[in-house]
């Protein structure tokens, strides 16, 4: 079976469960980018509770067919498969065109937040050198490439070996032969997923907050180390 997923930034345990359980995984690269999703956000456990780490992004400019926009009397038009708004409004851009923003200190801030949250976790020092480059190096320009590199490293550390490909075109919901999890795995208003049941594991702040389920794969990895794979089954 093949699972159809959206790209994620240090995705949740539920997302990595699909990588472990399915024979093949397709990452949708032609869907429209949506804010406040796991595409550029992950959730970690801190002393204050759940904290969201969000990667700021930039939209690549689109070449707009002005003759097409004029013919639509100022309404939306489709440009290269993406919806563009005229009159100076921002266009809707698909995921493969989203770039990482170099403004601000988000890399340093994310790394400091992770150090603060997991510095006392059982496996932070063990994996620290594997994780640091994602917050200190700027070799990735596109969000999709950045997320793919993170996914590859996380799979290596957890010791899972999924077959992952990117989609060659946008796959419409309920019309593909894959099991579609794109709207199932999201931080707000997720759809039901009978295939996933969070298994409690040790967390640094469990005595204060109880078990916080389905956080970033970082939470599972840094708390459980090599045993992480058992919580994806």
Feature roles, as predicted:
Residues 1-76, 83, 87-233:
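Residues lining hydrophobic/aromatic ligand-binding pockets adjacent to catalytic sites
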């Amino acid at each position: 079976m093949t699972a159809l997923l959206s790209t994620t930034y240090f995705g949740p345990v539920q997302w990595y469960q699909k990588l472990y359980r399915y024979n093949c995984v397709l990452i949708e690269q032609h869907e429209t980018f949506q804010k406040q999703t796991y595409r550029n956000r992950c959730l970690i456990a801190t002393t204050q509770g759940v904290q969201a780490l969000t990667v700021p992004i930039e939209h690549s400019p689109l070449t707009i067919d002005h003759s097409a926009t004029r013919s639509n009397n100022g309404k939306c038009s489709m440009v290269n498969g993406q919806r563009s708004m005229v009159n100076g409004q921002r266009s809707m851009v698909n995921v493969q065109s989203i770039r990482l923003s170099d403004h601000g200190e988000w890399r340093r801030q994310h790394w400091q937040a992770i150090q603060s949250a997991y510095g006392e976790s059982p496996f932070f020092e063990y994996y620290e050198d594997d994780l640091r480059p994602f917050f200190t190096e700027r070799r990735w320009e596109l969000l999709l490439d950045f997320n793919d590199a993170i996914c590859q490293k996380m799979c290596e550390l957890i010791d899972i070996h999924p077959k992952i490909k990117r989609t060659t075109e946008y796959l419409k919901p309920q019309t593909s032969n894959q099991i579609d999890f794109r709207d199932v795995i999201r931080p707000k208003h997720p759809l039901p997923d009978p295939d996933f049941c969070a298994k409690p594991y040790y967390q640094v702040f469990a005595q204060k907050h109880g078990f916080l389920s389905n956080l970033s794969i970082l939470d599972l990895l840094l708390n459980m180390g090599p045993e992480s794979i058992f919580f994806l089954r």
